[in-house]
Amino acid sequence: MGKVLLATDSYYYSPTANGICVEAIADQLVAMGKEVHVLCFRHKNDLKEEQINGIKVHRIEMDWVNKLRFLYEKELTGMEQSFVKNIMIFLNRLEAVFFIHWFPMRSPIFCARYKRKMEQLQNKYSFDIIVASYSPFEAAYALTYMDERIPVKKCLYTLDSFTNLKKRFFMSREYQERKGWKWERKIYSKCDIILNLKCHEKHYNKTRYDVFRTKMKIVDIPHMKEYDFEENLEKEKTLTIMYAGAIRDDIMPYALTYFEEMMQNDRLVFKLYTRSTVASYRKMINKDANKNFITNGFVDRKTVLVEERKADFLLSMGNANSDFISSKVIELIATGKSIIHIYSYNKDSALPYYDIYPNCCCLNINDSVDINKKKIIEFINSERKTVPFKELEKMYFLNSPKYTAQIISDLEGTF
């Protein structure tokens, strides 16, 4: 039985999108008979170590920026949330200035601590394979700089890209590209295998990556997963559409415009689960529609998954000028339910996934409002069928956790 360590940021109780991907792979590796460990960030009240679903979880104390980020995202509301968020943004940008030469590294001390913990676990458990997700940067750094005398296969799981980025802060795309490429060369040279997401495939087809080509494999967001809940999934009497996640300010007003008349006539309830401020959106619709606009703050992932399966329709918001594919897209498709996808960018990265999904209505906000309203009414009035999971698993086989887990497992036999 092979031993695998997966290194990530926040896992299970307060997961990031990357932590959720790692969880799906970890669960699949356990199902394949592997001994699986996870190294992740420690949140308040978390144990330093515990067993979760057959996986040994080891936690490391976070740096201050991450502590503040998760504090305002998960625990605070109102003025307190805004205050802590502003402090976090200030410290984050201050670190970016201090360590701009080493972008995207922000905290050398945290990197060293993550590396030390990874080495300690390797010396204790003798893993066959270590899989470090990027992000966090600390996991990729630790994988690269851990003691080379340690016999272990190294896998970089690039859930985010070092180089295929949008402009951030005060740095130009060219600067980010140059610094990211420098880190890629360092990290890739130390890895036995590099897993790149399909949404970045075109980027990694550049000739400069030819030297690493034999190490690279294309995978995808591993969210094509079936869930079995014991909770009562009894549906509401009124049709419901549900959205969970960050709100795009350029898309949300259009969504409300499209749904307002049906909400006003009690034909549709719009449920929203988000950390984003929603007060301004209530002012965009009339009083009669507002009663069917149900807003909620942050809730745990299990609640979101249950609510998605109770809803009649799921709302998806597109990406803005980015190759990156949100894990939420695959999560919604995996339900087999009716999806309304609203986007603004003609090359929206989610469209190739929704184009082959037989239960989706895609709306470009640049089209006529009346035409889009008509499309929605026709879609809502049409016969609703849930696409069987077995059918979806075949259509989106790259998105199955089995696909990525098998590539990692195969690495064990290359010693």
Identify the role of each PLM range.
Residues 162, 200, 218-228:
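Short beta-strand->alpha-helix junction loop in the catalytic core
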Residues 4, 129, 145-165:
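Active-site proximal beta-strand in glycosyltransferases
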Residues 280-303:
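Nucleotide-activated donor-binding/catalytic signature segment of Leloir-type glycosyltransferases, i.e.
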Residues 186-216:
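A short, active-site helix/loop in glycosyltransferases that binds the activated sugar's phosphate group
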Residues 78-129, 176, 180:
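Conserved nucleotide-sugar donor-binding subdomain of glycosyltransferases
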Residues 24, 138, 145, 162, ...:
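Membrane-proximal helix-turn-helix segments that form the acceptor-binding/catalytic region
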Residues 309-394:
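Catalytic binding pocket for nucleotide-activated donors in carbohydrate/polymer assembly enzymes
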Residues 224-227, 234-284:
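Conserved catalytic-core segment of nucleotide-activated headgroup transferases in glycan assembly
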